[in-house]
Amino acid sequence: MGAVLSIPLALASSLSGVVGIASSFLVTSVLSLTNSIQSNVGAVISYAVLYFVNSLLSWCMLSSWFNSKLSKLSAGYLQFDCQNDGKCYSVIAVHRLSFTLVMFHLFLAFILSLCNTRSRVAIKIQNGLWPFKIVLWFVLGIFSFFIPTKFLSFWGNIISVMGSALFIVYGLMLLVDFAHTWAERCVDRVLTSDSSSSKFYLIGSTVGMYVVGLVLTILTYVFFCASSCSFNQAINTINLLLCIAVSCLSVHPTIQEYNPRSGLAQSSMVMCYTCYLILSALANRPDEGQCNPWGNSASGTREFSKVIGAAFTFFTILYSAVRAASSRESDDSYSYLYADSHDMGVSTPLEDGSSEEDKHQSDYNFIWFHIVFVLAAFYTASLLTNWNTTSVYENQKNDVFVRIGFSYAAVWVKIITSWVCHGLYVWSCLAPVFFPYRFMI
């Protein structure tokens, strides 16, 4: 009995040692930031550091060296090895840390929902109390390693995939908004100051993104569209036709009449990203020989996909924060793209008589801020595990085994989100025609 009781204690001690350095670094950096920057900027940076450390630990869980050390420190309680029989816990460990970050932000969102967002109490909870937050994150991390593996398998296969899909859709809305905003600013500079650099950036980036999208499409045809792979051929062809359609739509005379700034610059960005999504989706298809030659061999391509996905994640978080902070200072002509989320992301102006400090510190909705991080945690876990699915079973000796493999769920998530991206961009082009009073040129 003593030996059994000592296992959880040894595990907690081991995990404390593993994440101790990261936690110490996090506490030091966060406290120094929040002490020097008493504003939303300090809070955003602090939460970003926490997200980065949690993601870094999740990535370490996929390292054989890190897992072997942690297994030894836990006296064999934690097993992370991936053997030929399919026994593998490293993917589950990633979902455990994802669960930690999700519960952390959901808890803060729940607490903040009980307070008035404009109150000093809510501002204090959002921007301060970092020693308590670090302890909360640490305790949740320890607790996550005692959650049954079967629950984590359900978490990773169902909940995490749905959360990842929502994060991608939200990121796509921001991507379309960014495409319009960036292109319009370049056009404005060209029209007002005849800036040669703006012309170069606008034309060069447009051509460059079309070239990248075309190259990705060709690579998809070459590697994934063999004569027997009709599904891959259909998906890639549909995406190519959609790219051509949205490009033609962006320069249609009617669209240009209601929004002269619309053009190929925005559609090129949409094409570039959707072509990447299709390539990534087919690369995640369960290995069926010629239809997915990257299924088991090309680990480098999967690492590249992780890098692109990580860049997309940080872009979404950063741009979401920037939009929330700056939206009150500029008119948003494309707010109809994401009216609900934008309304949640930015609160209404404070009533007259409020202090300048409150006006500065409560210019966005704290609850939506944490929801974005919840979705980002889901997406990061799916990204690090290559959207793998897990199946848990027990043998006659009651040993728990976890099988790792690809599934069509991840494939369809990426395919559908690419179609959603096209749909969002089409809507952004047509909305000024249908609702000209909401579109201010």
Swiss-Prot record:
Coiled coil: none annotated. GO terms for cellular component: membrane; plasma membrane. Keywords: Membrane, Transmembrane, Transmembrane helix. Its main location: membrane. It comes from Schizosaccharomyces pombe (strain 972 / ATCC 24843). The keyword Membrane applies. PANTHER family: SERINE INCORPORATOR, SERINE INCORPORATOR, ISOFORM F. Pfam families: Serinc. It is found in: Membrane. InterPro entries: TDE1/TMS. It is a multi-pass membrane protein. This is Membrane protein PB1A10.07c. The chain crosses the membrane at residues 1-21, 41-61, 97-117, 128-148, 158-178, 206-226, 235-255, 263-283, 307-327, 364-384, 415-435.
